[in-house]
Curated annotation (Swiss-Prot):
The lineage of its organism: Bacteria, Pseudomonadati, Pseudomonadota, Gammaproteobacteria, Candidatus Pseudothioglobaceae. GO terms for molecular function: DNA binding; DNA-directed RNA polymerase activity; ribonucleoside binding. Its EC number is 2.7.7.6. This is DNA-directed RNA polymerase subunit beta. It catalyses: RNA(n) + a ribonucleoside 5'-triphosphate = RNA(n+1) + diphosphate. The RNAP catalytic core consists of 2 alpha, 1 beta, 1 beta' and 1 omega subunit. When a sigma factor is associated with the core the holoenzyme is formed, which can initiate transcription.
Amino acid sequence: MAYSFTEKKRIRNNFGSRESILTEPDLLAIQIDSFNSFIQADNKIKQDIGLHNVLQSVFPITAVNGYAQIEYVDYQLKEPKFNVEECKLRGVTFASTLRVKLNLVLFDKNGSTLKKKRKVKQIIEEDVYLGQLPLMTETGTFVINGTERVVVSQLHRSPGVIFEHDKGKTHSSGKILFSSRIIPYRGSWLDFEYDHHEHLYVRIDRRRKLPVTTLLRAMGLSSEDILETFFEKTPVKLKAKSCDLSMLPIHLQRTIAEFDIVVNQHVVVEKGRRITAKHVKLLGKAGIKSINAPLEYLLDKVICADIINKDTGEILISANTITSEEVLELLNTNKVKKIEILYINSSETGAYISDTLRLDETQTEIEARMSIYHVMRPGEPATEDAVNLLFNNLFFKNDRYDLSKVGRMKLNRRLGISRETGEHVLTNDDIIRVIKLLINIKDGNDSVDDIDTLANRRVRAIGEMIENQFRIGLVRVEKAVREGLNLAETDELTPQDLINSKPVSAAVREFFGSSQLSQFMDQVNPLSGVTHKRRISALGPGGLTRERAGFEVRDVHPSHYGRLCPIETPEGPNIGLINTLAVYAKTNSYGFLETPYQIVKNGKVTKEVIYVSAIDEITHTIAQANALVDDRGKLMDDLISCRHKNEFVLVDSSEVTLIDIDSKQISSVAASLIPFLEHDDANRALMGSNMQRQAVPVLKAEKPLVGTGIERVVAKDSRVCVTAKHGGVVEAVDASRIVIRVDSKKTKANELGVDIYNLTKYSRSNQNTCINQKPLVRTGDKITFGDVLADGPSTDMGELALGQNMKIAFMPWNGYNFEDSILISEKVVQEDRYTTIHIEELTAYSRDTKLGPEEITSDIPNVSESALSKLDEVGVVYVGARVKGGDILVGKVTPKSETVLSPEEKLLRAIFGEKANNVKDSSLRIGASKSGVVIDVQVFTRDRVEKDIRALSIDAERLERIKKDIDDEFSIIDGDIFRRIRLKLLGNVLSKAIGDIRIGERLSIKLMKKFDNKDIAKFKVENATVNKEVAVLVKQAKAKKVEFEKFFKKEKAKINEGAELPPGVMKMVKVYVATRKTLQVGDKMAGRHGNKGVISRVSPVEDMPYLADGSTIDIVLNPLGVPSRMNVGQVLEVHLGYAAKGLGYKIAAILDERRPDMVKQIRVFLDKVYNLHGKKEDLTLFSNEEIIELANNLREGVPMATPVFDGIREQDIKSLLRLADLPESGQEQLYDGRTGEPFDRHVTVGYMHMLKLNHLVDDKMHARSTGPYSLVTQQPLSGKAQFGGQRFGEMEVWALEAYGAAHTLREMLTVKSDDVAGRAKMYKSIVDGKNLTESVMPESFNVLVKEIRSLGIDVELEQH
């Protein structure tokens, strides 16, 4: 296999037994692809999706009078004014201007009013401004008002039809009541439900229920039509004493014979006997077409159609009448010989519709529609037109009802209609089919749906959500436009005059700013960002609420396999409602989640991969990824464990149709990063995957010794690393940028020959962690497309590195690791292993107040010189200044209201000109508990406000940086163009004298070296073709220069213009303070297996346990944390980590020996390490220099990869330990650092990747003096943010009671808590220097009294 530039530097030893046929898809594709399909920026011809689809559905808008119309033509998105970084800095939204091309068509008023025959009088075309559309950044986020936000995808119930039952919970009898619901994408919901009397009802939008026949009547069906639609008929010939039933024998099955059934004078079934399949067979063989039955059989049957007297035309018996003796008598009297009755077999089909029809009070179509109108619009007067309009708009009009493409597909599939497309509104046939299917389910001929399967839940991604917001905004615009169009001609209006963009802008802005699904991006480390973008939430508008969501909807469902991760979900109230996409999952065009499988044909695994949704998966038999397959792809076992119809079954290998693509297919990105996941309990794996997202990036990232092989994928797809856009050679590198000269073969015609990558240096993330990029390449390195050029936060050589590899021992140590506490060595702190940088942004605003403008200045009243020492003359802190709690960062004074001065004060003021008393100090100071170094200052000034010296110097610096980039870019491009010109001129004969070179002289390299590029451009040779080619290249160089000059002017104008600031703000100063935080007692740490704890002590190195070679342990963990938690993966990680480190030490020893055959030795040893088991590595592809570089990078340990559910075998860990000359047990003899004595037993020692979590004691430590109190109870508030107190609870009271500390206890429960009067007295006594405390009545007692009174019990306090 080919290795990339960074992979060659350090190979991870992969122990996976099966290599995936499919590479992991782009982890951010769900966000990026959805948004791109919404805006269709690259499409010349736009498809009917996204923004284009919305505009097409709303336009054309026609005037009420029909003489004017606005038509949609096309739309355009302009280039944003500022790039992403500038938007973050300025606090503005990264958005593009949306312009829509519209035609205002005016029709001739004298012509026809018919749509097709209208005569066009005038067309006015105009590009109309329709607001700002926030754009997605390359990383799948949005910058809204300067902060990065992520729009989380939503999992909601799919449009279509669903059949369910209440599990017998609705009615006291426990009877199961079946129901069905047609859910549109947009429009009224339609519910059909049975009551406990087995009558069928309909509800529209969950309103009052109506008999289902009312809806059928409203659709235009008569009683006869209804009965004919839902029932089979039995024709009956009436005789004097009997009747002949024209009935199929099958219709009699499972019924009890009400009379003797006679065939050829032989009784086949006796009266009172149940008719079985055997009887039906006999009747069928005899060819019976009709059965003779006594007239009594017709009693209690239902007549199918109206029976009319042929002579008079009157209805004798109406349809749906139950036959009685009177009815039979009436038939006999009127000599009716033929009737039709409904075929109702109590064991097979019920008479639900017939019974419901009898309840229905409506008789005609208009009555039925009136009935529906009264339910939908109670209290409103019902006219025939209004009634018809409402009914038709409910389900049958596109503008009010939309099933969507998904809804139609789901509806058709469930109703057994072969085609997947159709109208997006309901038809009469749809409604009838749904009712028929519901009756079938009730009769036991079909089953209800599983509402929690992913076949009935779909993902609504970002593109679809913005599309819906746009539709909401445009519908608001439509009303106003329709009214305005009437005046279009008389007032000579243009499309821009008619269309107000504010409703559209407001809808989009509201969605991004305040929607539950538009969230502040989790940016602690690269993994947290990737996971946030891949999150799928069932909450949000149109979704579930956490209070109402039951257990079933939160539970893991078999259809989640390979689509949603069964492990990664939050703990707490949102458990199961917020999920994460599995690694390979993607959404299809309908929004359903799909997962890839390899096709299996006749027991042989093919190379063909298909993506399957939960809808299609139900028919397949799917084998697991670990099924044994031989070299030819044949399944080796006869019986294979498979999934089929949501069950695990053992099937013959020939029955298998699909096989999993990879063992990690089931899990999410975070869960796939946990080595030995298969050995961890699910609850701890959940904590492990959640805690990895909280790991703070440390100063020097270190790759995990034990990984899973997906680390490189996460680092690349998170976009925190810098990857090469083209192949080429590294021209220049420094800490802040990388310049690549691109291979001329790799560039397209219009692309530049140089790539400049500006690195992000010490930038602040949303969670105040540090984003910093460090170059990995050196000048002269040859790189190819996709190579990692620079590491970002928490990445090491292009691999995700969230923590540090620490030497761990599992043993108790003087109680310091009681209850998951962690003991760490002082060496860890000294080596800055877990030192992190946190950057805080502090902002000062200079506002224009009623009393005059605030001023940013270093001249602040009543402030000492030392306090101002870190400010420049403008009043802004210097970059590089060390600041601590209370220091001024930006000096600012605010005008005070004028006080009335005495004549003496006025005189003094006039003499000394003292104005200090007119202003008060309102400077920006750093918080009392904070300290750090100022790393950056940005000053923004409003337009037409003069910039101060500091702002001008910052602007000049920025311009200088841009100019340097442009100059470097141009010099490389210019150099490349003239290198090509020299190559073309080489060997040609000069046709025009230049300087001291005569005509006819042949050009050589030496000759051309004497001339600069300016002169070379003037060379003319005898070959006309070469002259033309040279002229084209010279023209190209000039064009590039002009292009760069234009770009520089544009950037300069951007910097010089004023900033967009909030109303009333004249100037804004942003100060960035970086704080270095070392590991200390109280910080939270964790492994990747849910093994978390708090540091209890930082022990001196000399006191830590040590090994026989004198090396000390870094971290001591409690062995009791393993068995009950059942996360044994951490122990296996420690063993494998120990082997990895030991192998690194052996490689280091070979390198340090420097023997003549060192390279050969290293090759032999690396071959033993890498080709022990699992994926084979071909080291012959490496040159000797590359092998030595690889070996040097492996000094600190050979990184291992043990993929989830396909990990390293136990014997392989033992083989590696043996190869590293370490004990196979993974246990060593440890010695006590304090006494030097050996411990009683051997201890498990090894290396574990430990993380420092973003729960730092510095941020949590807090002490209250006095502060705010709760309004009702008058007790102190809780929490650091509210400057609250510590809760002194019931158990703490017991503790003080046990020690008899009566005075302390009284203080705690009264004056320190909610005794208002006592508090005031306490202050007074402290001021007076007295030590007396007197407690009065606590406020909580008054609250209790009030609560008792609210129950109607009068409580009064008697004074004694």
